């Protein structure tokens, strides 16, 4: 509908980063490169523990109100996310085999203090996708774009400039 023919650069955070990685495996001709922040390749105990804490915060604090600034249907957004991650059947979710198919350049960014995943997530990308550049940010939690915006923007701009191929 938009008439966009050029392969796109995908920039995703958290579950959105995982979706970007999956798009690059399914439609490689549509993806020129990826910048992923705090992606999930597999489920870790720390992820589940902190998503349980998020549920408690949603029920007992003003988290629902805060999230309402970003979501029209905050309950649907929160509970859809929370329930899938806490479903015991989801514990086996793993996209590592799919990620190994990626051939586009990848910049993978993770906060060293990420409460929803360890550095094993982005290191797993580097083990599977040749040429992946890692940016592990100290004093940074799950939202590098919020916690260290200057570092994220500088790294992303430099990476895209180094790998962008004009149409």
Feature locations, PLM:
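Conserved hydrolase catalytic core segment
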Residues: 6-44
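Short beta-strand/loop motif that positions the catalytic acidic residue
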Residues: 102, 108-110, 114
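Catalytic active-site module of serine/aspartate enzymes centered on a nucleophile-bearing elbow/loop
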Residues: 132-133, 138-167
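Alpha/beta-hydrolase active-site loop
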Residues: 1
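A catalytic-pocket lid/entrance helix-loop region that shapes and gates access to the active site
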Residues: 47-72
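Conserved alpha/beta-hydrolase "acid-adjacent" motif
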Residues: 115-121
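Active-site nucleophile elbow and catalytic-triad environment of alpha/beta-hydrolase enzymes
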Residues: 81-98
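A short beta-to-alpha transition loop/helix N-cap that caps and shapes the active-site region
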Residues: 40-51, 116
């Amino acid at each position: 509908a938009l008439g966009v023919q050029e392969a796109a650069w995908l920039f995703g955070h958290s579950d959105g980063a995982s979706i970007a990685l999956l798009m690059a495996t399914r439609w490689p001709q549509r993806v020129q490169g990826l910048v992923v922040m705090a992606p999930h390749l597999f489920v870790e105990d720390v992820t589940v523990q902190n998503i349980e804490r998020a549920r408690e915060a949603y029920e007992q604090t003003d988290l629902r109100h805060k999230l309402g600034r970003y979501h029209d249907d905050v309950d649907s957004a929160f509970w859809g996310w929370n329930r899938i991650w806490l479903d015991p059947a989801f514990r086996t979710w793993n996209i590592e085999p799919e990620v190994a198919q990626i051939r586009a350049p990848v910049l993978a960014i993770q906060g060293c203090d990420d409460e929803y995943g360890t550095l094993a997530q982005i290191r797993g990308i580097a083990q599977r996708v040749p040429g992946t550049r890692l940016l592990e940010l100290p004093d940074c939690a799950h939202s590098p774009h919020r916690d260290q915006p200057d570092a994220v923007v500088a790294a992303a701009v430099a990476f895209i400039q180094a790998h962008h191929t004009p149409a």
